[in-house]
């Protein structure tokens, strides 16, 4: 109440923030006349001037007014687009590291040029993050003309670029790319063996387009790089045959308060999208699988596969969560993004769920993959020194943006007043009535020529409504995951007279719906039909203004056409679309018909936002039924009772603001539930993130070539101290120390047989120092033989290889820990606290193994001089006195032997690097919107027990690292 009164007197916080920027907007405008007087060369030279001033101590804030004015003038000259004052405000909001909420059609793409240019002047790079490759290419080409005019370099990161192309793109001043590609490049860089192979620079400043989609909707989807697992697919087939034999039950209230009973073999909780076996179901499965107790530790894999198969059968439906389409190796399961309706061909559900769906659908089951590297978008984007975002719908999630990312949301005023009419929801009893009446309204609007965009929540529902419209004789386009390739073309013409477009949620982003049609798209199509457009390679594309040719893309292919011809065709089309625009405006603009409320208000707002852009008229209406998931699951009994009181008859809707408010309350409840799920994920991933930062930080030190000899010697010292503590504890008298075991420990770990007589009268500290001195001398002998440079390179390669292998195993252990940690709640323990505690223990154990394995590799690595090994190995020692070792007197190696030894070590490092490169080619990339298509997964060749050990020791695998 008090907040409302204060807002009326002083304005809201958002209004005050926007008002505070108006003097800066005026200052930018004041520079416009003098900048217009500059030649193109002088205007572009401002970039050099700004960089020089930064070098002399000026801050980016000091340059903001002048830099924004320069970009505004460059936009006018190069793009024929002058930034509106509200766009300048949007640019300032982004520069401050906040989220700018700008309505559809307000020019977010152009707004980004202002902070991009200003922040690129600092020389550390700016990343512009988009939701798909199409937008990354389009925006880099479109806005790239402006940046290149001002002397900045522009790069774009899309799938199928090699490392050098990626590196060049990241070294540009401004880099466009998808969230997937940026995240995967970060993970890939932390799997490389050479610093020169790394492609990313520092994470300086990122502007995330459609920030709500990337940082909210996809926050629960981690990016995963995986390699092939050895697990068989037989269990999936066996369990898949059994699940259909189970009978669905329900949860029934007992006589006592809080008492619950279950019937059947399993139950479904639609509110939380989960399924659970009943006691009867568990007993039936144990009998059918013939495995005894399903919850015995030895049956943990069976239990896991059963739970996933149950989910696949009862929670995941074809043409809703996924579609079946032809792939390279036959039919395949492709996920449909629940928020956009787009296909996600590169993405697979984890933990065996995708395989369970494949078994259910009878398509070829792909083997589960083992995670090699993973990160959530939440933790990736929090690495940037400064983060900003743009979207048309962020205000409803403002609290989450601030709590998780410390990002404030500022709503930018529209350039022209919004005059869209938002009609009250129409609620029917059944889904059949809802679709029947929605189709009638679509036909009525279509009959008078008004364009209609229809929103549905799934492929299945879009095709159902399409069938009804066909029967009514309404000509229309269908846009869903099955024909997404035509998305941009269909959406761009959805504002034409008589157009009816039935779409899933995917029509919400990327392409404006212009009333009367999009003249640019029409001109592209006409140029292609007339065959006057010349196909180009990417290298031939010109970004700067070209008086002879106009460049454009179509279906990710580059073209150019003579500028005079383009201008002629465009002028004709523009005159036509302008005339049609006025006719559509007279009819009332674009009308939105939504056939269901989404769980998130943002998705509903995105659909509404397609109408009424830039001051155009428009209208929207939602058609709902009591059978819709949101109303049925989350509306509750109060909603049902309210409907009955209002009185419902067949084909007679209830049109009530009270109902609309109740629906919004249900949506808020779902959003709160989803926020808790994302927050819960982040709490667990923060544990992994700290460990990832430690491991990746260590790798980075190695890649940057820091001298690791001291680190290796510290490892040696630490291992010796562990052995001394274990075999010669303070609590025991020296006569009871386990000296023989100590000797064997050192022999096994370092390949060195210590002289027990030499240690007989020494204290623990003296023993540690003596053993360390002997091992250090042995290591120095190897270094003297091959040279310091070669041994340093070998240390680096060995440590990287060991870290990667141990990290891979650690991620598997962490996955297994996370799967079962929820059960700790039954023992009155906090699962998160337990997870933190046990994951720390796992991490400590991994770091110890890294040290042990690294030292063992380095000490056992065979150096061949061309005349046999230089140093003895444990299984090659001659039998002799167990307590004494006669020190071998070895002549100094010849120069020829040194060269042979050096060559051996260099061959080893080269072989390891080649092996790593082959492994990198076999990786699979999973996550986000699936725009990164997986590369072929090829199982690595298994090492036989009698094969030479890959570590290079020269021994058989079974006697070295296979022991």
UniProtKB/Swiss-Prot annotation:
Q: Which InterPro entries match?
A: Helicase_ATP-bd (IPR014001), P-loop_NTPase (IPR027417), SEC_C_motif (IPR004027), SecA (IPR000185), SecA_CS (IPR020937), SecA_DEAD (IPR011115), SecA_motor_DEAD (IPR014018), SecA_preprotein_X-link_dom (IPR011130)
Record EC number: 7.4.2.8
Q: Any signal peptide, and if so, which residues?
A: none
For the region Disordered, give the residue spans: 868-909, 924-963
Q: How is the cofactor bound?
A: May bind 1 zinc ion per subunit.
Q: Does the keyword Ribosomal protein apply?
A: no
Biological process annotations from GO:
intracellular protein transmembrane transport; protein import; protein targeting; protein transport by the Sec complex
The GO terms describing molecular function are: ATP binding; metal ion binding; protein-exporting ATPase activity
Which reaction is catalysed here? ATP + H2O + cellular proteinSide 1 = ADP + phosphate + cellular proteinSide 2
Membrane topology field: Peripheral membrane protein
UniProt keyword Acetylation, yes or no: no
Where found?
Answer: Cell inner membrane; Cytoplasm
Where does the UniProt entry say this protein principally localizes?
A: membrane
Q: Where does ATP bind?
A: 87, 105-109, 512
Q: Which UniProt keywords apply?
A: ATP-binding, Cell inner membrane, Cell membrane, Cytoplasm, Membrane, Metal-binding, Nucleotide-binding, Protein transport, Translocase, Translocation, Transport, Zinc
List where this protein forms a coiled coil: none
Which NCBIfam families does the entry mention?
PRK12904.1, secA
Instruction: Please explain the role this protein plays, according to its UniProt record.
Output: Part of the Sec protein translocase complex. Interacts with the SecYEG preprotein conducting channel. Has a central role in coupling the hydrolysis of ATP to the transfer of proteins into and across the cell membrane, serving as an ATP-driven molecular motor driving the stepwise translocation of polypeptide chains across the membrane.
Which protein are we looking at? Protein translocase subunit SecA
Taxonomic classification, please?
Bacteria, Pseudomonadati, Acidobacteriota, Terriglobia, Bryobacterales
UniProt gene name: secA
């Amino acid at each position: 109440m008090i907040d409302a009164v204060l807002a009326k007197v002083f304005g809201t916080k958002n209004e005050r923030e926007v008002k505070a920027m108006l003097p800066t907007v005026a200052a930018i405008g004041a520079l416009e006349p003098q900048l217009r007087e500059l030649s193109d060369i002088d205007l572009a030279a401002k970039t050099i001037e700004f960089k020089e001033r930064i070098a002399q101590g000026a801050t980016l804030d000091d340059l903001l007014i002048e830099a924004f004015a320069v970009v505004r003038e460059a936009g006018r000259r190069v793009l024929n687009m002058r930034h509106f004052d509200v766009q300048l405000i949007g640019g300032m909001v982004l520069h401050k590291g906040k989220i700018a909420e700008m309505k559809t059609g307000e020019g977010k793409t152009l707004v980004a040029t202002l902070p991009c240019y200003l922040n690129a002047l600092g020389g550390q790079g700016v990343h512009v993050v988009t939701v798909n490759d199409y937008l990354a290419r389009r925006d880099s080409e479109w806005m790239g003309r402006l940046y290149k005019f001002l002397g900045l370099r522009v790069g774009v990161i899309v799938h199928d670029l090699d490392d050098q192309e990626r590196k060049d793109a990241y070294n540009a001043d401004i880099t466009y790319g998808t969230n997937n590609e940026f995240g995967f490049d970060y993970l890939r860089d932390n799997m490389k063996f050479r610093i020169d192979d790394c492609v990313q620079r520092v994470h300086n400043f990122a502007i995330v387009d459609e920030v709500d989609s990337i940082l909210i909707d996809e926050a629960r989807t981690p990016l995963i790089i995986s390699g092939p697992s050895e697990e068989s697919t037989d269990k999936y087939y066996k369990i898949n045959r059994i699940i259909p034999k189970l009978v669905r039950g329900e949860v029934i209230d007992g006589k006592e308060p809080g008492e619950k009973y279950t019937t059947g073999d399993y139950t479904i909780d639609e509110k939380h999208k989960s399924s659970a076996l009943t006691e009867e179901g568990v007993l039936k499965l144990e009998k059918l699988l013939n495995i005894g107790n399903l919850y015995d530790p030895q049956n943990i894999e069976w239990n896991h596969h059963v739970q996933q198969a149950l989910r696949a059968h009862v929670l995941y439906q074809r043409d809703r969560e996924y579609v079946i389409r032809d792939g390279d190796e036959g039919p395949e399961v492709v996920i449909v993004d629940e928020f956009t309706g787009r296909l996600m061909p590169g993405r697979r559900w984890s933990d065996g769920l995708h395989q369970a769906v494949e078994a259910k659908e009878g398509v070829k089951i792909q083997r589960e993959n083992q995670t090699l590297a993973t990160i959530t978008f939440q933790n990736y984007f929090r690495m940037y020194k400064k983060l900003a975002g743009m979207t048309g719908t962020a205000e409803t999630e403002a609290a989450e943006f601030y709590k998780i990312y410390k990002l404030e949301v500022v709503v930018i005023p529209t350039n022209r007043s919004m005059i869209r009419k938002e009609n009250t929801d129409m609620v029917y009893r059944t889904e059949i009535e809802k679709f029947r009446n929605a189709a009638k309204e679509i036909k009525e609007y279509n009959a008078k020529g008004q364009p209609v965009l229809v929103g549905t929540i799934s492929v299945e529902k879009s095709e159902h409504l399409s069938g009804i419209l066909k029967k009514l004789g309404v000509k229309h386009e269908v846009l869903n995951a099955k024909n997404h390739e035509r998305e941009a073309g269909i959406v761009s013409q959805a504002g034409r007279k008589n157009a009816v477009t039935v779409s899933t949620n995917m029509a919400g982003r990327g392409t404006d719906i212009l009333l009367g049609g999009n003249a640019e798209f029409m001109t592209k199509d006409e140029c292609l039909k007339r065959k006057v457009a010349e196909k180009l390679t990417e290298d031939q594309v010109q970004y700067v203004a070209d008086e002879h040719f106009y460049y454009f893309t179509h279906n990710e292919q580059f073209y150019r056409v003579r500028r005079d011809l383009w201008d002629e065709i465009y002028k004709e089309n523009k005159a036509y679309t302008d005339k049609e625009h006025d006719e559509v405006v007279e009819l009332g603009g674009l009308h939105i018909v939504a056939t269901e409320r989404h769980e998130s208000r943002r998705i509903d707002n995105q659909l509404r936002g397609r109408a009424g852009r830039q001051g155009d008229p428009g209208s929207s209406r939602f058609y709902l039924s009591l059978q819709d998931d949101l109303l049925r699951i989350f509306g509750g009994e109060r909603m049902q009772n309210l409907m009955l009181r209002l009185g419902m008859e067949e084909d007679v809707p209830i049109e009530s603001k009270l109902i609309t408010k109740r629906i919004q309350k249900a949506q808020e409840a779902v959003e709160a539930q989803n926020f808790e799920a994302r927050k819960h994920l982040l709490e667990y991933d923060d544990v992994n993130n700290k460990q990832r930062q430690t491991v990746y930080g260590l790798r980075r030190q190695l890649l940057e070539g820091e001298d690791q000899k001291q680190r290796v010697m510290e490892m040696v010292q630490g291992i010796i101290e562990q052995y001394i503590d274990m075999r010669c504890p303070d609590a025991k008298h020296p006569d009871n120390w386990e000296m023989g075991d100590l000797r064997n420990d050192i022999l096994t770990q370092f390949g060195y047989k210590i002289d027990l007589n030499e240690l007989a009268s020494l204290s623990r500290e003296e023993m540690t120092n003596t053993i360390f001195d002997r091992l250090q001398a042995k290591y120095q002998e190897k270094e003297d033989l091959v040279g310091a440079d070669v041994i340093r390179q070998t240390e680096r390669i060995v440590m990287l290889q060991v870290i990667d292998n141990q990290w891979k195993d650690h991620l598997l252990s962490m996955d297994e820990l996370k799967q079962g940690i929820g059960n700790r709640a039954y023992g009155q323990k906090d699962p998160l606290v337990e997870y933190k505690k046990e994951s720390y223990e796992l991490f400590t154990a991994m770091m110890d193994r890294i040290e042990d394995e690294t030292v063992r590799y380095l000490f056992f690595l065979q150096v061949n001089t061309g005349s046999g090994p230089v140093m003895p190995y444990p299984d090659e020692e001659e039998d002799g006195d167990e307590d004494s070792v006669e020190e071998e007197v070895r002549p100094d190696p010849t120069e020829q032997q040194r060269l042979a030894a050096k060559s051996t070590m260099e061959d080893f490092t080269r072989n390891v690097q080649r092996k790593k490169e082959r492994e990198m080619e076999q990786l699979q990339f999973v996550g986000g919107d699936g725009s990164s298509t997986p590369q072929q997964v090829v199982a690595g060749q298994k090492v036989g027990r009698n094969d030479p050990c890959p570590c290079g020791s020269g021994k058989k695998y079974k006697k070295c690292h296979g022991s």
